[in-house]
Amino acid sequence: MVKLRLKRYGRKQQPTYRIIAIDAKNRREGKALKELGFYNPIKNSIQLDVQNIILFLKNGAKPTDTVFDILNKHQVFEQMKKE
């Protein structure tokens, strides 16, 4: 099963995350199938590749709780319903 989850980057006390598609059996820092976005909680900046995210969701990928909240904030699920 494929999951959409966050992969941690950055230094101590300065985390940044990439939103990735990864096999659920792999560890958090394992090799990603595809990088789908970027999240910086300090600056509160988010960049998403919406088309690829929708493609993975339609093919059965499950987002983690945090990724679900990020996608919901950017109305990705509403865009998915329109297509």
UniProtKB/Swiss-Prot annotation:
Query: Which Pfam families does UniProt cross-reference here?
Result: Ribosomal_S16
Using the record for this protein, list the coiled-coil segments as residue ranges, or answer none: none
Give the subcellular location.
Plastid, Chloroplast
> Which controlled-vocabulary keywords does the entry list?
Chloroplast, Plastid, Ribonucleoprotein, Ribosomal protein
- The answer on whether this UniProt entry bears the keyword Plastid reads yes
Q: Tell me, what is one Gene Ontology molecular-function annotation carried by this entry?
A: structural constituent of ribosome
Q: Which gene encodes it?
A: rps16
**Keyword hit for Membrane:** no
What PROSITE patterns does the entry give? Answer: RIBOSOMAL_S16
Q: What is this protein called?
A: Small ribosomal subunit protein bS16c
Which InterPro entries does the annotation name?
Ribosomal_bS16 (IPR000307), Ribosomal_bS16_CS (IPR020592), Ribosomal_bS16_dom_sf (IPR023803)
Family, similarity comment:
Belongs to the bacterial ribosomal protein bS16 family.
Specify the domain of life of the species encoding this protein.
Eukaryota
Instruction: Pull one GO CC term from this UniProt entry.
Output: small ribosomal subunit
Q: Name one GO biological process term.
A: mitochondrial translation
Organism annotation: Chaetosphaeridium globosum
